[in-house]
Design a protein with these regions (language model features):
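Flexible loop/turn segments at secondary-structure boundaries
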Residues: 89-91, 135-136, 210-213, 224, ...
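A short, Gly/Thr-enriched small/hydrophobic beta-strand-prone motif that recurs across taxa
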Residues: 79, 332-348
């Protein structure tokens, strides 16, 4: 098992060897989970240095069914440092997939063990070991960090890509190296013999000026200049049944299974198989299937070149023109027909920005001439106006669906025959899939799209609250093509990397009439301010100077060595002073200080996040966390944001719908006001309207102490994700549920309310070949009965525990700022904790006390 040596060892510490009760080789059979057992090979063993502290890992102690004592040599020390971890503790969702009480997968605050420190005089000191405090899980959910412990490897600097031998970040985006430079370059020249029928017997080299070095001479006969290759072509290689595709390139850019002599294979990937025969009837963004044996290759070569296959066969490229069973290669028709493609709005005939996909009969992606043929989905490696559905931040995936964004018109090179076009523009326009036959006479293709859901006309505008890295103009194109009226482009800091900082000016709204646009699609640059453990916060639309520092407290958000000098709550207050909107991004993670920010009333909205996945829907984990705040009376609106950081995520995959004041013109300011009111819903496709006694989401209704009945009216519709059920959520539980048709439905319920409550609408749906998801969710309507505020004791306790965790992190392993800043931040957290704690006392709710809230009268 690998040892960890993350730096030199400090002489101020020494290992304390002991005899454990389980050998590492036997750990899998010691009652641990199968997930932990599968990870044993990665567990550190032997001599280790972690954060500069030496450890010796031998037999381990499994603290499970009985107490285990270990002995070591008498040692006088001020500190003992433990290297330990814990197994996973599954979280079991209840009805509807929701979790209550919500402590997270890390089981925040749960007492995992007690450690008793034994002294030579027979006395002992006992310490409770709590999850996400003194110990974490061996495999944690992102954002659920420890407050008083650190991971086994200390943070490390990483060389910029251009400082590494390979890959070279910028140059690799070109996907080509001319290879015409270096310490020594020989040049090749081809001379055409005017008398090929005559024999050549030698060459004499005569000097004239300077020095020439001739290294070699070669002779041959080909049909044309041997150093001139033809334009790019495509072919399909069929592999043997027992052989998979090997995509790796060697240092010379060569594949292992197919190479060219007088030419070069440009790219190779498993062929994508689309449902071409039923293309018009399949759904938008549906992923293709990856062929198990066919590899689509691009190449450029001399007409007399040959392919060399892994089994030793040599295939002249001239043989590809006619399919032969004995040859595992087949040529594809070249895409040489230049066509103008336009997408127009039905009725007006106006060209409109859209998302576009085109492929040929063999599944080959056909990009416009000014777009990437091979889009790059990796994190921060490409900021192009492309979308690679099915990819991840680190790879294109097995079956990517390539798309791009166009302003309504583009030039594209197409092959003869059938090509398959997909056009989409948001959630209110019906997506189009159509087949087009390309002939020598084809010069233009026109695709007409139709708006069928009138939510914009009803006053609703759409937004993505969380986009990174794009330029403002690229964001404007992608937003308009996706039907997203407001794109919030967020500058931030990532260690030593600053992004979009130069785009922030605190005043410009791109696309607005003041900025020369039509005012229908807007881009505003804000900031995402972050701390790795305490959390992230999005500051939108604020005016004036950038709120800096944008990150604090060290990696992987701010630079290594940065202290914690400001809290999320303080950033939020500054944003509001500058007229901005405060959103908690990718809620609920990181799960720490945002509890204090919500309790303090400094947050306008919580963000449900997609991260590129079109099929997972709104995460019940996220909703469960949101519900506990609603259950305690904290009305915070729901918004949707993608956290787009690469081409694997489309702007608006999940989006916010917010209804403007009927008297207000659409502006960025009007949108912020709508979110502050809470008249919003979040969706992956289905659209909704929802009122309680005529009051929209974000409203508060007062009822007498006797309670009463409220009328709930709703309407839903979708032209993208087919709907399956509509549910009424009351205080985090499903009160009503009804099956609905996939395209449109409406209904009403009469609901008895005997105590203070919140009500929200949830829509489920799914494509025929996908599992059901939560596809849309409204912000709530709050109902107060007899003036009694909502306060669910079990949820309130978990909120207090989360604030206590933030305090513990600030007090222990968080890099300490100067004393004044530390005390200021601590007061902010303590004040939030006391606010909720005092509410519990006022209500007479029984709860345990921690050192933060302990009172003498409780003993």
């Amino acid at each position: 098992m690998p040892g960890i040596q993350d730096g030199p060892s400090s002489s101020l510490f020494k290992p304390l060897p002991f005899k454990g009760n389980v050998a590492m080789s036997e750990l899998a059979g010691a009652g641990i989970s199968k997930e932990m057992a599968a990870a044993i090979e990665h567990a550190p063993g032997g001599a280790c240095v972690c954060w500069g502290i030496p450890f010796e890992v031998g037999d381990v102690v499994v603290v499970a069914e009985r107490a285990i004592s270990v002995e070591f040599s008498p040692t006088v020390a001020q500190w003992l440092v433990f290297m330990h971890t814990s197994d996973v503790r599954p979280v079991e969702p209840g009805p509807g997939g929701f979790i209550s009480p919500m402590r997270g997968e890390g089981q925040l605050g749960e007492r995992a063990a007690d450690y008793a420190m034994l002294y030579a005089d027979g006395t002992q000191e006992r310490v409770p070991i709590r999850r996400r405090h003194q110990v974490g899980a061996f495999d944690r959910r992102w954002g659920e960090n420890c407050f008083e412990a650190v991971a086994q490897h200390k943070p490390r600097p990483v060389r910029a890509a251009h400082e590494q031998l390979r890959p070279v970040w910028g140059l690799t985006q070109m996907r080509v190296d001319t290879a015409d430079s270096g310490p020594w370059v020989n040049w090749l020249w081809a001379w055409e013999n005017p008398h090929p029928e005559k024999a050549l017997v030698g060459v004499r080299f005569e000097p004239v000026a300077g020095v020439v070095v001739v290294a070699a001479v070669s002779a041959g006969s080909v049909s044309s200049l041997p150093l001139r290759w033809q334009t790019r072509r495509k072919a399909v290689l069929t592999l043997p049944e027992s052989e998979g595709f090997w995509p790796e390139l060697d240092e010379d850019g060569l594949l292992g299974q197919i190479q060219l002599d007088m030419g070069q294979v440009i790219s190779a990937a498993s062929r994508l198989v689309y449902p071409n025969d039923a293309w018009n009837d399949t759904y938008n963004n549906q992923l293709p299937r990856k062929s198990e044996r066919d590899v689509l290759i691009e190449y450029t070569a001399h007409p007399d070149a040959c392919f060399h296959l892994a089994d030793g066969r040599v295939v002249p490229i001239v043989q590809l023109a006619s399919a032969q069973p004995s040859i595992p290669l087949q040529a594809l028709p070249p895409a040489t027909q230049r066509v103008n493609l336009r997408v127009v709005e039905r009725g007006s005939g106006k060209c409109v920005p859209v998302k576009l996909h085109v492929h040929g009969a063999w599944g080959e992606y056909l990009a416009p001439v000014n777009r990437h043929r091979i889009p790059n989905p990796a994190w921060f490696e490409d900021y192009s106006v492309d979308f690679v559905h099915g990819a991840t931040w680190v790879e294109s995936g097995d079956n990517p669906h390539y798309c791009t964004y166009i302003p309504g018109e583009t030039a594209i090179d197409l092959p003869p025959g059938k090509v398959y076009v997909e056009v989409a523009k948001g959630f209110e326009i019906r997506p189009v899939r159509k087949m087009v036959e390309v002939t020598p006479a084809t010069r233009e293709i026109v695709v007409e799209i139709e708006k069928v859901l009138p939510w914009r006309e009803k006053g609703w505008v759409t937004a993505d609250t969380h986009v990174h890295f794009l330029s403002p103009i690229s964001a404007l194109l992608e937003g308009s093509a996706e039907g997203v009226n407001v794109v919030n482009l967020l500058a931030s800091q990532w260690g030593e990397l600053m992004t979009n900082v130069g785009d922030f000016d605190g005043k410009t709204t791109w696309g607005s009439k003041e900025a020369g646009g039509d005012g229908e699609y807007l881009v505003r640059v804000g900031t995402e301010n972050r701390q790795h453990v305490l959390g992230h916060i999005s500051l939108l639309g604020y005016r004036g100077k950038i709120i800096a520092p944008m990150t604090t407290g060290g990696p992987d958000e701010s630079a290594l060595g940065d202290p914690i000098e400001i809290l999320l709550t303080e950033w939020a207050r500054q944003c509001r002073k500058q007229g901005g909107l405060v959103v908690l991004p990718h809620f609920p993670n990181p799960r720490a200080e945002h509890a204090a920010s919500i309790v303090s009333g400094d947050v306008d909205a919580l963000e449900m996040t997609a991260w590129g996945n079109l099929y997972e829907g709104i995460d019940p984990y996220s909703l469960s966390d949101w519900y506990r705040y609603l259950n305690c009376g904290y009305l915070t609106a729901a918004v949707g944001g993608t956290d787009k950081m690469s081409a694997n995520t489309a702007v608006g995959t999940v989006r916010t719908y917010a209804r403007l004041d009927p008297q207000a013109e659409f502006t960025y300011q009007a949108w912020m006001e709508a979110v502050r009111r809470g008249e919003t819903f979040v969706t992956y496709g289905p659209l909704l309207e929802f009122v309680v006694d005529g009051h929209p989401p974000g409203s508060r209704i007062e009822m007498p102490a006797s309670g009463g009945t409220v009328d709930v009216l709703w309407q839903v519709a979708s032209v993208t994700v087919p709907m399956s059920r509509v549910e009424l959520i009351v205080n985090g539980e499903i009160r009503e549920s009804v099956a609905v048709p996939p395209g449109e439905a409406s209904g009403h319920w009469s609901v008895r309310v005997n105590k203070s409550a919140w009500l929200a609408l949830l829509v489920r749906g799914h494509y025929a070949d996908k599992p059901e998801i939560i596809a849309a969710h409204s912000s709530p309507v709050m109902v107060t009965v007899g003036g009694g505020a909502l306060l669910a004791a079990a949820d309130a306790v978990t909120i207090l525990e989360q604030i206590e965790g933030a305090l513990a992190y600030l007090d222990t392993v968080g890099t300490r700022a100067e004393d004044v800043a530390y005390k200021r931040m601590r007061l902010v957290l303590v004040a939030a904790h006391r606010t909720l704690h005092n509410r519990m006392h006022q209500q007479g709710t029984y709860h345990g006390h921690t050192p933060v809230t302990d009172h003498a009268e409780h003993h």
